[in-house]
């Protein structure tokens, strides 16, 4: 059992070493444990970070960086390791493409964590061994960490393939953004208020599937005694596909899915499937704050895409954007009384 150490490594020690030794660009999907490092990167104009929509995509981006002569760094939570197994086994390991994987360890045995991390927490090291990806656990003292990074750098150069550095909770010290405005866009309708409005306009007849993160938590706080709610705690990006499967099996019941922009982007192909089969009873609501709020507020790429147009072009019967409580109320009432599928972008 690992005991969280009160001694932590300053994030500029890690980021500084990697920069001086030619590592970068960075890509990946954020985790709260990695927030300090991501904040450090955001404030360093010499380091580029590309926010990926999924871990598998991040490995593809990293492969391109490697082919371009760079030494990429891929950030991910261990829960996302499964999302990139194919890219690792059929791309990076086959073509011997180097990359430094910074993988956070959630669900470590003996440390309280959320239930969705329990199984992967126990199997992370077994999975890395199975994939024949060498790994080390990051040291929690400055001098030891520097020596470790030097050793790993030599191994990556010699082996020319991925190497994983696993980071436990409490290893990296905090690092706050001096200017957090770029990660905190302002909206006329908050997520919490939107969930209240949605809940108020539904009866007990509809089923609600809510995505992982703060959306499920806030829906639970809003109406935890409501029957017909399914609160996802993991499997990011799967809420709308769960809703689709349920809608197909229960055609006489309205199925509402509360999605987030990060989850929508992670498995955007789901929208094409839903549009193709066109379940008339499905209402897909995307609560978009352009950020991964539950992992520290890092930006997503949703700010430059039109979610409602994507849904419309994929075959949804109706799709639109709402900005105010009155617009959201009207959109919900219309969707409940007309055949779908419907897409509401909040």
Give the role of each language-model region.
Residues 3-129, 133-346:
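Thiamine diphosphate
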């Amino acid at each position: 059992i690992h005991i969280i150490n009160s001694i932590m490594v300053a994030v500029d020690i890690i980021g500084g070493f990697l920069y001086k030794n030619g590592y970068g660009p960075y890509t990946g999907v954020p985790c709260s444990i990695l927030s300090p490092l991501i904040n450090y990167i955001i404030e360093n104009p010499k380091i580029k970070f590309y926010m990926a929509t999924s871990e598998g995509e991040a490995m593809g981006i990293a492969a391109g960086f490697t082919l371009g002569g760079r030494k990429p760094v891929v950030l991910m939570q261990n829960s996302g390791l499964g999302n990139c197994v194919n890219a690792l086994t059929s791309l990076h390991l086959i073509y011997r493409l180097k990359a430094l994987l910074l993988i956070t360890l959630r669900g470590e045995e003996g440390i309280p964590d959320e239930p969705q991390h329990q199984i992967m927490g126990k199997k992370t090291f077994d999975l890395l061994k199975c994939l024949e990806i060498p790994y080390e656990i990051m040291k929690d003292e400055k001098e030891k960490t520097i020596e470790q990074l030097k050793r790993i750098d030599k191994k990556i150069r010699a082996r020319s393939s991925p190497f994983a550095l696993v980071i436990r909770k409490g290893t990296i010290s905090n690092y706050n953004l001096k200017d957090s405005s770029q990660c905190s866009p302002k909206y006329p309708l908050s997520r919490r208020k939107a969930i209240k409005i949605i809940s108020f306009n539904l009866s007990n007849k509809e089923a609600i599937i809510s995505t992982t993160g703060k959306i499920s938590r806030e829906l639970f706080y809003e109406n935890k005694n409501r029957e017909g709610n399914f609160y996802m705690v993991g499997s990011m990006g799967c809420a709308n596909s769960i809703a689709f499967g349920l809608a197909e099996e229960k055609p006489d019941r309205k199925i509402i899915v509360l999605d987030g922009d990060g989850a929508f982007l992670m498995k955007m192909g789901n929208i094409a499937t839903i549009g193709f089969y066109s379940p008339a009873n499905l209402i897909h609501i995307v609560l978009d704050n352009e950020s991964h709020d539950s992992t520290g507020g890092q930006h997503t790429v949703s700010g430059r895409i039109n979610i409602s147009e994507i849904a419309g072009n994929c075959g949804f019967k109706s799709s639109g954007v709402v900005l105010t409580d009155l617009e959201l109320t009207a959109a919900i009432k219309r969707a409940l009384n007309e055949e779908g599928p419907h897409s509401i972008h909040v």
